[in-house]
Structure formats: C-alpha cells, structure tokens
C-alpha cells in the first residue's frame, strides 16, 4: 500500500492560517432535503446514525464534545482513550456510533451504551478543522479530506468516513438497500463555517426513523418527579422490542399531563419481548437508581 506522507508544517501553512488551539467549536450543520440529486462537484458519504462529536486533541488534553458542548470523555471512554493514543494536535469532526452485528449504526444501542458489553463503539471522522497550529476551515473540503487521510493513522475504533464517487441517486439507492439511515452530499469546494446550517452540506434520509412506542415508565427511589424515565420500544415482526429509556426534556407540567394519559393504560404485564434491565449500573452511576417500573399497554407513540 502507498502510505501518504504526513502533512508538514510548511504544507499546512500554505493552505491554512495560523490559529491558536480552539477550546470550543460548534459543528457545521447540514440542511435536510427530500430527494437525492445528480450534480457535479459534490462528494457523497454515509449518514451515520449516532452522536455528532468534535474531538479537540493536543499534547496537553483530549476532549470529546457533543453538538451542545457537553463532554463525551467519560460516557464514551473507549473513543476518548483511542484518540488520546493518537498523539496528534488536531481538531476533528465526526460521529460516534455503535455498530451492530451487520456493521450498521444502531442509535438505540448507542443511547443505552454503558460499557463494551453493550456494543462496539466507532468514531467515524469526516473532517479536520485545525492541525498543528493552523486553521483549515478556510480550506476546501476536498483539500481538508486529503490532509485528514494523511494525518489519521489506521485504528480499530477511529475510522475515516469514506466519500464515494458516484451519482447521488445511485448512492441513495444503495444506501436504502443496505438499510442505512441516509446519505450526506457535500460540495467538494465547501469551506467550514462553525455553527452554521449550510446549503453546501445536505442530508437525505433513506430510512424514516421508527416512531417509538411507550411501554412503561420508571420512578427512581427518592425522586420528586412524576416519573424518572419512559421505557420506549419499536415493533419488529409484531413484537415490541425495547430500545431504551427517555429521561430528559419533560417539564413538570408535561409530566402531569402525561401521567393523566398513562393512568388508564397501566397494566401488570410487561409489553416488551424481553424485560428491560432498568437498574443496570453504568460507569458514571455504579450504584443502581433503584427504579420501580410501571408497565403500560403499548398504545402511546
């Protein structure tokens, strides 16, 4: 194999502009469109079904940040450890996923990921924004990708998200056949504008995400809330498969209104094909929440 030489300070300086290491950076977002298209000058990638992540790496620190600048360092520690081992000074943009048995990204498994026993984490990197003291955000996507490919070493957890030279419609049809979430179309000469929703980056969804069904709720010991989390599932071959807990985003008023709807649906029967382990300890919560479960007839979506 031909191994590309790592970019030197001189080659980066010729493309990027000098900039201090950024401690915070909002990702550039894509615009959702309905249909694939065929136009020259676009690069096509897989749309990963995971958590968008900015990785800030230098000799002193490693940080994994969500779209909302929440730290993923503890939550996704295998990715954090892998990036630390790379020993590069760079800012990367990508998506953390859990790969299922077929190698596809599984968002439900990612939401419930606590340790390696819950699935294999991968970090698919699709952009490089800063390297060795230089910002690459004013460099074209095509050039940024060349720098990324020659910067990132091969690693079992860290992967470069491939681009495909084909038409948008062909790639979209292939994505549907492979049961992928969708595709990304990015202008080859697009620059990186942090925090913006760009029309030079487009996302086209192939799989309409399943509507989840509520099969119960939990109440953690000592919690003043009406409920601590909802237990959600999706139907697969007419059986309700548990996909995870939804525990955030409910105001007290919303919880009150939901409890009124839950009341007539309360049942003693677990509606899921397997009983969810609601007290499973995690790395950040080694002590189980001591949650009690109330099952619901699976009528609410």
Which ranges hold each PLM region?
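Catalytic cores of nucleic-acid ligases and guanylyltransferases
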Residues: 1-301
């Amino acid at each position: 194999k031909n191994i590309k030489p790592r970019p030197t300070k001189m080659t980066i300086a010729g493309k990027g502009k000098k900039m201090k290491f950024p401690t915070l950076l909002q990702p550039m977002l894509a615009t959702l469109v309905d249909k694939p298209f065929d136009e020259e000058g676009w690069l096509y990638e897989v749309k990963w079904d995971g958590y968008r992540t900015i990785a800030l790496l230098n000799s002193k620190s490693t940080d994994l940040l969500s779209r909302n600048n929440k730290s993923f360092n503890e939550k996704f520690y295998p990715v954090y450890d892998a990036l630390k081992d790379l020993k590069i000074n760079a800012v990367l943009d990508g998506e953390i996923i859990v790969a299922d048995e077929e190698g596809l990204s599984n968002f439900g498994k990612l939401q419930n990921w606590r340790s390696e026993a819950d699935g294999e984490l991968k970090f698919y990197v699709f952009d490089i924004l800063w390297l060795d003291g230089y910002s690459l955000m004013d460099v074209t996507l095509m050039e940024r990708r060349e720098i990324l490919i020659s910067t990132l070493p091969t690693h079992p957890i860290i992967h470069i998200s491939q681009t495909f030279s084909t038409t948008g419609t062909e790639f979209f049809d292939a994505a549907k056949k492979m049961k992928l979430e969708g595709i990304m179309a990015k202008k080859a000469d697009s620059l990186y504008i942090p925090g913006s929703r760009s029309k030079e980056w487009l996302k086209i969804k192939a799989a309409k995400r399943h509507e989840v069904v509520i099969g119960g709720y939990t109440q953690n010991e000592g919690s003043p809330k009406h409920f601590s989390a909802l237990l959600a599932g999706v139907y697969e071959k007419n059986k309700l498969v548990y996909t995870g807990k939804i525990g955030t985003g409910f105001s007290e008023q919303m919880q009150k209104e939901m409890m009124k709807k839950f009341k007539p649906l309360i049942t003693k029967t677990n509606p899921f094909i397997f009983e969810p382990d609601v007290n499973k300890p995690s790395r950040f919560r080694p002590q189980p929440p001591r949650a009690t479960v109330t099952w619901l007839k699976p009528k609410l979506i």
